[in-house]
UniProtKB/Swiss-Prot annotation:
Enzyme Commission code: 2.7.1.30
Native organism taxonomy: Bacteria, Pseudomonadati, Pseudomonadota, Gammaproteobacteria, Oceanospirillales
GO molecular function term, any single one: glycerol kinase activity
Family recorded in the similarity comment: Belongs to the FGGY kinase family.
Pfam families to which the protein is assigned, alphabetical: FGGY_C, FGGY_N
Signal peptide start-end: none
Chain residues that bind ADP: T12, R16, T265, G308, G409, N413
Organism: Chromohalobacter salexigens (strain ATCC BAA-138 / DSM 3043 / CIP 106854 / NCIMB 13768 / 1H11)
Name by which UniProt lists this protein: Glycerol kinase
UniProt note on regulation of activity: Inhibited by fructose 1,6-bisphosphate (FBP).
InterPro entries, A to Z: ATPase_NBD, Carb_kinase_FGGY, Carb_kinase_FGGY_CS, FGGY_C, FGGY_N, Glycerol_kin
Entry GO terms, CC: cytosol
Length: 501
């Protein structure tokens, strides 16, 4: 009798393996961090072998620590850091270069040349995305142009491209499966989200040979079986989704207007828009939420590059505290209107500003400012940025979110969650199970494997641990937010992005 689903959650700084039971409860967790490589300013890389080995080890560790046998596991769901780009040899499976991570900004000049040439409207109309180094297409083009012999080998059909899910699937299946799902494909800037196919015009624009590309499947599908020697048996791989879409599924945001926000290294707010690919007038992204039985559900997304990374910087860079758990007590020492604003534009600004040249700053310092105020300002920045996204979504979509479901490491901080509810002016729901990204991948696998009849059954499993109700006066909320907007304007790099909301 199958008791568990194994979820592989391959993230930006660590790989995790989690076993879930049929009720969506966590039975066991294993996690392993891996090295980050910064070979030049603005460049971020991962060693693909580090990713692969960390995934294998965590899967084996969680089975060992829980005592789960291979016979008790129904199958595998997989979720991954999106956009991160790999290129490997089809014969050997060996990568030609380190993975270029979603945070990497090396293709900024090329992206600007595409914008200057007037391509952004065309690209957005096909992909729902903007021209930015964030997405996979320009990273893949860089690999083809800069790895010796790569373009020639690609033209001969010797190489394979994939995001992290595709690379792991290739490895797990012994090279038998070169595939991805529609959510990951929708983040490459090469996939037409309306036709649900790789787009020939985009491939031509970015100079990408079609022979490199994986097959695109539903998010719940037959992705093959793992080679028995990896985990002890030929487990079926039955669900794949990019991390933020997987979290949307894990939070059971299945109706149009339902929204979730994940607070990890970055912050990602996604609202379900149903069968309609809503176009943002505020520079948010239109993306695939999930594709099931050939039917596509769309979402609108705002991506904030720095959320939990601010806490890491305050801890490791400024050494203001020893452990992230100390931040709540520090923040509680401050008065509400302390006047300090921290804009964490360490790698530029994401949605809705999309200003890669912006840089971080702290405003409002006085002789009274201490560690507590700076820490509080860093935490509040995440909430202000979420308010930025909320304002855009409310303007773009009729069925806007009347409440927000949250997950990720930062949501365990009650002070942050209360300030978030106050700043948004809507209830904020924190679920009982915070491993929503991995849970979403497990649910997708469970649908394919017959564990769950439909999305309604999965929605019935969601449980709320605590709701944070807004309690701040409207006038105070708006006063604080105006201060944030002023700080944002001050860090923007170019006249073009100043005044853009």
């Amino acid at each position: 009798m199958h008791s568990y689903l194994l979820s592989i959650d391959q993230g930006t700084t660590s790989s995790r393996a989690i076993l879930f039971d049929r009720q969506g409860r966590v039975a066991g967790v294993a996690q392993e961090e891996f090295a980050q490589h910064f070979p030049a300013s603005g460049w971020v890389e991962h060693d693909a072998e580090d990713i692969w080995q960390s995934v294998l080890r965590t899967c084996r560790q969680v089975m060992e620590s829980t005592g789960a046998s291979i016979e008790e596991i129904a199958g595998i769901g997989m979720t991954n850091q999106r956009e991160t780009t790999l290129l490997w040899d089809r014969r050997t499976g060996e990568p030609l270069h380190r993975a270029i991570v979603w945070q990497d900004r090396r293709t900024g000049a090329y992206c600007q040349s595409l914008i200057d040439a007037g391509h952004e409207a065309f690209i957005q109309s096909r992909t729902g995305l903007l021209i930015d180094p964030y997405f996979s297409a320009t990273k893949l083009r860089w690999l083809l142009e800069n790895v010796p012999g790569a373009r020639e080998r690609a033209e001969r059909g010797e190489l394979a491209f994939g995001t992290v899910d595709t690379f792991l699937l290739w490895r797990l299946t012994g090279g038998r499966e070169h595939a991805t799902d529609a959510t990951n494909a929708s983040r490459t800037c090469l996939f037409n989200i309306h036709t649900q196919q790789w787009d020939e015009a985009l491939l031509s624009l970015f100079e990408i040979p079609a022979s490199l590309l994986p097959e695109v499947k539903d998010s719940s599908a037959d992705f093959g079986r793992a080679e028995p020697h990896w985990l002890g048996g030929p487990l079926p791989i039955a669900g794949i989704a990019g991390d933020q879409q997987a979290a949307l599924v894990g939070q059971t945001c299945f109706a149009p207007g339902m929204a979730k926000s994940t607070y990890g290294t970055g912050c990602f707010m996604i609202i379900n828009t149903g069968e309609k690919a809503e176009v943002s007038h505020n520079r948010l992204l239109t993306t695939v939420a999930y594709r099931l039985n050939g039917k596509t559900t769309y979402a609108m997304e705002g991506s904030i590059f720095v959320a939990g990374a601010t806490v890491q910087w305050l801890r490791d860079g400024l050494k203001l505290f020893a452990d992230a758990s100390e931040t709540e007590a520090l923040a509680r020492q401050t008065r509400a209107g302390h006047g300090v604003y921290l804009v964490p534009a360490f790698t530029g600004l994401g949605a809705p500003h999309w200003d890669p040249g912006a840089r971080g700053a702290i405003f409002g310092l006085t002789r009274d400012t201490g560690i507590a105020e700076i820490v509080a300002a860093g935490l509040q920045a995440v909430c202000y940025q979420t308010r930025d996204l909320q304002a855009c979504m409310d303007d773009d979509i009729e069925a806007s979110a009347g409440r927000l479901r949250v997950d990720g490491g930062m949501v365990s901080n009650n002070w942050v969650m209360q300030f978030l509810a106050d700043m948004l002016g809507v209830p904020v729901d924190r679920p009982t199970v915070l491993e929503t990204t991995a849970l979403g991948a497990a649910y997708l696998a469970g649908l394919q494997l017959g564990w769950y009849a439909d999305l309604d059954e999965i929605a019935g499993l969601w449980r709320c641990e605590r709701t944070f109700e807004p309690s701040m006066e409207e006038a105070e909320r708006e006063r604080l937010y105006r201060g944030w907007l002023d700080a944002i304007e001050r860090v923007k790099c170019s006249a073009e992005t100043r005044g853009r909301a």
